[in-house]
Amino acid sequence: MNIFTKKPNPREVLRESKREMTQATRGIEKEIGSLQSEEKKLVLEIKRTAKSGNEGATKILARQLIRLRQQIANLQGSRAQMRGIATHTQAMHAHTSVAAGMQGATKAMAAMSKNMDPAKQAKVMREFQKQSAQMDMTTEMMSDSIDDALDNDEAEDETEDLTNQVLDEIGIDIASQLSSAPKGKIGGKKAEDVGSSGIDELEKRLAALR
C-alpha cells in the first residue's frame, strides 16, 4: 500500500459514483427503448399473422411478446434500483455535509462563548429565539396560503381532466344516441299533445261531477 496516496475527497467520490450510475442508467434506458421498439414490431406481426388465420404462428409470436415484455419489466426494475441508489448516495453526502457544518458551527459558538458575557449571550439567544418564532409563524402562514391555493387549482384541474376523460370514453355512445333520438321540436310537440289531452280529459270528468 502506498502511504503517499492521497485520500479521496468524499465529494470527488460522490461525483465519480454519480457519473458511473448515470452511465449505467442511460445504458439501461437505451436497452429498454430498443426492446419497446421490438415490442411494437412484434405486435404488428401478431396482428398480421392473426388476420391470415395462422393460429400456430400467432401463438408462438404471442409467447415471444410475453417474454419480451418481461425483459422490459426487469430492466425497468433495474433502472428504478439504480435511481434509488443514486438518491440514497446523495442523501448520505447531504447528511455528511450537515454534520460537518454542525461541527464547524459548534467550534464557532465555542469561540464566541469565550469572548461574550454570559448575561449578554443569554439576551442575544432570547432575542434570536423570539425572532425565529416570528419568522416560523410567518413562514407557516404563507405556506398554508400557498398550499390552499395550489389545492384548489389541483382539484379544479383534476376535475377537468376527469370530465374530459369521461367525455372521451362515452363520446361515441352519446353521438350514436343523439343521431337516433327524435329532434327536440318533435319531442316537444308530442309532449305538448299528451299534456293537452290529459287536461281535457280531467275537465270532462269535473264537468260530469257537477
Swiss-Prot record:
PANTHER family attached to this UniProt entry: CHARGED MULTIVESICULAR BODY PROTEIN (PTHR10476)
GO biological process: protein transport; vacuolar transport
Coiled-coil stretches noted in the UniProt entry, renumbered to this chain: 28-84
Keywords of the record: Coiled coil, Endosome, Protein transport, Transport
Compartments it resides in: Endosome
Residues spanning the membrane: none
Known partners and oligomeric status: Component of the endosomal sorting required for transport complex III (ESCRT-III), composed at least of VPS2, VPS20, VPS24 and VPS32.
Name of the protein described by the UniProt record: Vacuolar protein sorting-associated protein 2 homolog 3
Pfam families: Snf7
GO cellular component: ESCRT III complex
The family this protein is said to belong to: Belongs to the SNF7 family.
Domain of life: Eukaryota
Protein task: Component of the ESCRT-III complex, which is required for multivesicular bodies (MVBs) formation and sorting of endosomal cargo proteins into MVBs. The ESCRT-III complex is probably involved in the concentration of MVB cargo.
Annotated spans, Disordered: 1-23, 178-200
Chief subcellular location: other
Biased composition (Basic and acidic residues): 9-23
